């Protein structure tokens, strides 16, 4: 008997605690975590600096709403803007889908403020941007739409790495192009440097906002603080969440100064967004991730080479956001790995996705590879 709605196809295990890169079930069995709560636990589990900061904040102040000044928001926003390509402003939300919704609203508001009727968006096939109506409409996967139609009007889907398909969808009412530079849920599909360069040119040429969904790729996951930095892009807006709080729910959008000005009092908001606890968590995560970036690149390259050596499929991704595309469905392998104490994820049917904590070491990767070699 359960009192929970049947939303999730849960695996047959109950975790009761975590430490570092490991989770432990009710029986005390140890599991090597290469999922990180779907890219959330950037610093692993029970990371001492994060744990201590949260304990201190809980005893001080949890929530005040956005009716008042919030120094914790200011501190975290400054740290996020510091890594942006230009001066910008931050709006805080609670999740990835809320961040994408905020980006959509901001883009429409920006063009309305400029007196232009630009309200449409182009996103990409196999993309995933969230499950609330705006972000769901931006998601280029019909399986997520089924049963929830009609969707929000104005969204169309181009093919990743096919610039002609983007041109075909563009018109004078296009407000923004929304893209993940590496699609996560869609199968760890990377946009090419040439394609992204041309996409940037289109946005500039056609007066369209470039919105990058960094919910999964951001905050050090790919070896750069923001994944767009691999490609020398200059986005107008980026959406953040997942790894930013290290396990505490938080989302954010970061927009360049001119675009950000379109959010004015009453235009958009959030009761919980940017509460002191979440922002305190985010501040610790950002400080630690800044120091971890060279490590993420090093162990990410090591992991990628080890996956290639398996010779079992196409290896995709960057840093510690990697995928192994198999020739058959991968759901069974997730269960086999679970039995052997390794947590991995199957996405897009045939892609094993790996999102370990950013603190992972080479010996952990060796252990994971050993399990993969055995089960594959």
UniProtKB/Swiss-Prot annotation:
Record pathway: Amino-acid biosynthesis; L-arginine biosynthesis; N(2)-acetyl-L-ornithine from L-glutamate: step 4/4
Reaction it catalyzes: N(2)-acetyl-L-ornithine + 2-oxoglutarate = N-acetyl-L-glutamate 5-semialdehyde + L-glutamate
UniProt key word Hydrolase: no
Positions annotated to bind N(2)-acetyl-L-ornithine: 131, 270
Keyword annotations of the record: Amino-acid biosynthesis, Aminotransferase, Arginine biosynthesis, Cytoplasm, Pyridoxal phosphate, Transferase
Single GO MF annotation: identical protein binding
Cleaved signal peptide residues: none
Compartment(s): Cytoplasm
Pfam families listed in its UniProt record: Aminotran_3
One annotated Gene Ontology cellular component of this protein: cytoplasm
Entry EC no(s): 2.6.1.11
Entry-annotated residues carrying N6-(pyridoxal phosphate)lysine: 242
SUPFAM superfamilies found in the cross-reference section: PLP-dependent transferases
GO biological process, one term: L-arginine biosynthetic process
Family: Belongs to the class-III pyridoxal-phosphate-dependent aminotransferase family. ArgD subfamily.
Other notes: May also have succinyldiaminopimelate aminotransferase activity, thus carrying out the corresponding step in lysine biosynthesis.
Subunit and interaction comment: Homodimer.
Protein name (record): Acetylornithine aminotransferase
Organism: Aquifex aeolicus (strain VF5)
Gene of this entry: argD
